[in-house]
């Protein structure tokens, strides 16, 4: 199994907690799916904690401490503040997969907006009251497809 790791030189804007969490994740050889199951979040929400893009609850801190063998005091110090969202990626992104996600919004953003406005009226989809997940589908020809679900309160 391939595991996501962190090259801190590629991500200079991440908080100190990112290096702490990714180092322990690599040492324990745990996937985000395994960590998510332990703390009771989905994989993407768990990864967002690692990248400093989500706020950790006291329960998250305790469970991460137990699973990753990191002092709860260290995690409390590093994770108890408010996340500084959106600063970890330069714009436009250079990493190819992240650029493709950016490109989706560039190409389909106004189409999404038009359809959402027709279905819901004037407003916006929340990125705070929000959940997302990633699933893998394999078609009849054996091709793998990524399915990304975005669910936000209107």
Curated annotation (Swiss-Prot):
Active-site residues, Swiss-Prot/TrEMBL: 100, 103, 126
Q: Which residues form a coiled coil?
A: none
Q: Name one GO biological process term.
A: cyanate metabolic process
Determine the domain of life of the protein's source.
Eukaryota
Reaction it catalyzes: cyanate + hydrogencarbonate + 3 H(+) = NH4(+) + 2 CO2
Provide the GO MF annotations for this entry. cyanate hydratase activity; DNA binding
**Is Lyase found in the keyword set?**
yes
> What Pfam families does its record include?
Cyanate_lyase
InterPro entries recorded for this chain?
A: Cro/C1-type_HTH, Cyanase, Cyanate_lyase_C, Cyanate_lyase_C_sf, Lambda_DNA-bd_dom_sf
Please provide the record's keywords in A-Z order.
Lyase
* Top EC class of this enzyme: lyase
SMART domains associated with the record? Cyanate_lyase
Instruction: Report the EC code(s) recorded for this entry.
Output: 4.2.1.104
Q: Which CDD domains match?
A: Cyanase_C
Job description of the protein: Catalyzes the reaction of cyanate with bicarbonate to produce ammonia and carbon dioxide.
Q: Tell me which family the UniProt entry assigns to this protein.
A: Belongs to the cyanase family.
Write down what this protein is called: Cyanate hydratase
Q: Which species is this record about?
A: Aspergillus fumigatus (strain CBS 144.89 / FGSC A1163 / CEA10)
- Name the gene that codes for it: cyn1
């Amino acid at each position: 199994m391939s595991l996501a790791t962190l090259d801190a030189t590629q991500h200079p804007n991440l908080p100190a907690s990112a290096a702490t969490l990714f180092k322990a994740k690599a040492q324990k050889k745990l996937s985000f799916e395994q960590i998510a199951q332990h703390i009771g979040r989905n994989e993407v929400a768990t990864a967002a904690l690692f990248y400093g893009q989500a706020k950790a609850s006291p329960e998250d801190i305790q469970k991460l401490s137990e699973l990753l063998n990191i002092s709860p005091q260290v995690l409390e110090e590093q994770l108890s503040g408010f996340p500084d969202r959106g600063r970890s990626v330069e714009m436009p992104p250079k990493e190819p997969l992240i650029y493709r996600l950016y490109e989706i919004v560039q190409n389909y953003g106004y189409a999404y907006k038009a359809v959402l406005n027709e279905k819901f009226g004037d407003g916006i989809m929340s990125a705070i009251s929000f959940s997302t997940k990633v699933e893998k589908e394999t078609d009849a020809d054996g091709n793998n497809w990524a399915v990304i679900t975005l669910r936000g309160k209107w």
